[in-house]
């Protein structure tokens, strides 16, 4: 029984094929494609894969992209299943006002982070940070309840917004400096410290709410860029979305 996990973000599709849907399942193959190139998957990277028996995916790119992905999956006899956030799954309780409106990527990442944290120690409050096109900073208490979270623009969106709305700011990407002395560094540093400040704020809110020190887990394509600028302790975790999909699939696909 093979399992295909798919993570479709705003710019890229990432996929991973496992021997079976379980946290510790061996990885058979993996890859990534920009969304412009996903129509080549069936004749390219997926053509020689062992056919998956189950698939679970997370998508934020919209229905048109979802249909393109499903068209590529027609080379296999497998039913596409896409995550929609629910009131609770895999040990987490969803505290969103309307649970189904929570982004699937946030929900899956929180499930992955919760089980990752729980596997390395006792349950404790958790802040989950995803750094990508957008940045999300989500809080979970020690019982596994998602309390709420923040959404803010990622580095690229911040810079493009300033460039489009302010004359004279079409400048190269700069470096993060404590005291920037040129416009490029000022823009890059401002965006970086804005994200770091949001994380610090949520850690403090969760600390005050729960009365204990939270653990912070960071993931996402640009997470490593934030590492030098963070003032709170955190763990950088790769493939948090895949971790969450594996946890969910292990409970959904029980043969």
Curated annotation (Swiss-Prot):
Cofactor requirement: NH4(+); K(+)
Q: Which organism is it from?
A: Albidiferax ferrireducens (strain ATCC BAA-621 / DSM 15236 / T118)
By what name is this protein known?
A: Type III pantothenate kinase
- In which pathway is this protein known to take part? Cofactor biosynthesis; coenzyme A biosynthesis; CoA from (R)-pantothenate: step 1/5
Q: Which Gene3D superfamilies match?
A: 3.30.420.40
Q: Does the keyword Transferase apply?
A: yes
GO MF term set: ATP binding; pantothenate kinase activity
From the UniProt record, list the reaction(s) this protein catalyses: (R)-pantothenate + ATP = (R)-4'-phosphopantothenate + ADP + H(+)
Write the gene name: coaX
Q: What does this protein do?
A: Catalyzes the phosphorylation of pantothenate (Pan), the first step in CoA biosynthesis.
Task: Name the residues that bind ATP.
Answer: 7-14, 133
Q: Which InterPro entries match?
A: ATPase_NBD, Type_III_PanK
Chain positions recorded as substrate binding sites = 96, 103-106, 183
Report any one BP term from Gene Ontology.
Answer: coenzyme A biosynthetic process
Cofactor, free-text remark: A monovalent cation. Ammonium or potassium.
List the NCBIfam families.
baf
What lineage does UniProt assign to this protein's organism? Bacteria, Pseudomonadati, Pseudomonadota, Betaproteobacteria, Burkholderiales
Its EC number(s):
2.7.1.33
Cite the record's note on assembly: Homodimer.
Major location category of this protein: cytoplasm
Q: Which family does it belong to?
A: Belongs to the type III pantothenate kinase family.
GO-annotated cellular components? cytoplasm
